[in-house]
């Protein structure tokens, strides 16, 4: 009872905090001068991280196993992973382009886990025999880490496509449209303002130079993040194959989850291969990564909706009483 109460408090603290953070984040996109608010949003992300970490530790202690046995726990772990990705640029002392991706992703994941699932699905369950293995932590954590990383990389690629083609659609060309102030559009305005200030200098500045700088940075970040995610996905699939051989006597069974994991791996392998061709860099490779975004959600959620196959214990079915 004590652990259940603690988990309830921590999940709602983390969700409330991240909701405030995303509000502050949107305000700072609209008003760049409010630097104090930007610092507050970072402190809020730290508070969210510790709340989610506290929940995972509490669930681990109370259940006696790593908290990755059902959809609810995996979503909480996914939001925790997104925060880890949020901190990587800060560790490297580089511009945090990922924050515009990771912050909304964290609140959506946390919000769905907290409010979108039935309360009965929040309960910790006894592991089925197939999950009573040390491979649980290695395989499932690697898969969720890869999902979070690949989703962020795919969204960066989608941002690149939106920025490059926004002038092709009247929806994006409206000067007062709110979308200009979200995602990376505020960065574009800053770069264009900077370009205007340099008009009277002797340096050559062509019209789309700063927009080009931004898209190149997005392309670079997307490639680096997806490369990391692809590595994690490969490790996760290999761990799952070894575990499957121990549990079911076969490395690969073409279970629906396994099939879509293979499709996901193939899509991002194509993305990485396309990067070796200069003609496919940028827009074309970003298109492949954007397709991968949809494939990941099919692999993670779509198969769970069906509730069939060897991975049915991760479905939306309610725990047995």
UniProtKB/Swiss-Prot annotation:
Subcellular localization: Plastid, Chloroplast thylakoid membrane
Pfam families per the UniProt record, alphabetical: Cytochrom_C_asm
Organism: Saccharum officinarum (Sugarcane)
Endpoints of the signal sequence: none
Keyword Transport: no
A molecular-function term among this protein's GO annotations: heme binding
Family classification: Belongs to the CcmF/CycK/Ccl1/NrfE/CcsA family.
Protein name, entry field: Cytochrome c biogenesis protein CcsA
Keywords: Chloroplast, Cytochrome c-type biogenesis, Membrane, Plastid, Thylakoid, Transmembrane, Transmembrane helix
One GO BP annotation of this record: cytochrome complex assembly
GO cellular component: chloroplast thylakoid membrane; plasma membrane
Stated role: Required during biogenesis of c-type cytochromes (cytochrome c6 and cytochrome f) at the step of heme attachment.
Intrachain S-S bonds: none
Membrane-spanning parts: 9-29, 44-64, 68-88, 143-163, 225-245, 259-273, 288-308
Keyword Cell division: no
Source superkingdom: Eukaryota
Chief location category: plastid
Membrane topology label: Multi-pass membrane protein
Subunit structure: May interact with Ccs1.
């Amino acid at each position: 009872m004590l652990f259940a109460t603690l988990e309830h408090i921590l999940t709602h603290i983390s969700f409330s905090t991240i909701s405030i953070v995303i509000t502050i984040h949107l305000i700072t996109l609209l008003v760049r001068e409010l630097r104090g608010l930007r610092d507050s949003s970072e402190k809020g992300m730290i508070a969210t991280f510790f709340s989610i970490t506290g929940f995972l530790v509490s669930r681990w202690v109370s259940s006696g196993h790593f908290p990755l046995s059902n959809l609810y726990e995996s979503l909480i772990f996914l939001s925790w992973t997104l925060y880890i990705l949020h901190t990587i640029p800060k560790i490297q002392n580089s511009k945090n382009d990922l924050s515009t991706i990771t912050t909304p992703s964290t609140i959506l994941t946390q919000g769905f886990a907290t409010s979108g699932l039935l309360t009965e699905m929040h309960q910790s369950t006894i592991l089925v025999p197939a999950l009573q293995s040390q491979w649980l932590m290695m395989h499932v954590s690697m898969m969720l880490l890869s999902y979070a990383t690949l989703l962020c990389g795919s969204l960066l690629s989608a941002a690149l496509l939106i920025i490059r083609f926004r002038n092709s659609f009247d929806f994006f060309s409206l000067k007062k449209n709110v979308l200009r102030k979200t995602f990376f559009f505020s960065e574009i305005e800053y770069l264009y303002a900077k370009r205007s200030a340099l008009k009277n200098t002797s340096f050559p500045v062509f019209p789309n130079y700063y927009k080009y700088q931004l898209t190149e940075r997005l392309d670079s970040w997307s490639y680096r993040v997806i490369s990391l995610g692809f590595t994690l996905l490969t490790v996760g699939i290999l761990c799952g194959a070894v575990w499957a051989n121990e549990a079911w006597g076969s490395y690969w069974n073409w279970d629906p989850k396994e099939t879509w994991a293979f499709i996901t791996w193939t899509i991002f392998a194509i993305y990485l291969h396309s990067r070796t061709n200069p003609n496919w860099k940028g827009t074309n490779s970003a298109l492949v990564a954007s397709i991968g975004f949809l494939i990941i959600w099919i692999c993670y959620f779509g198969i769970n909706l069906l509730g069939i196959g060897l991975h049915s214990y991760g479905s939306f079915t309610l725990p047995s009483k």
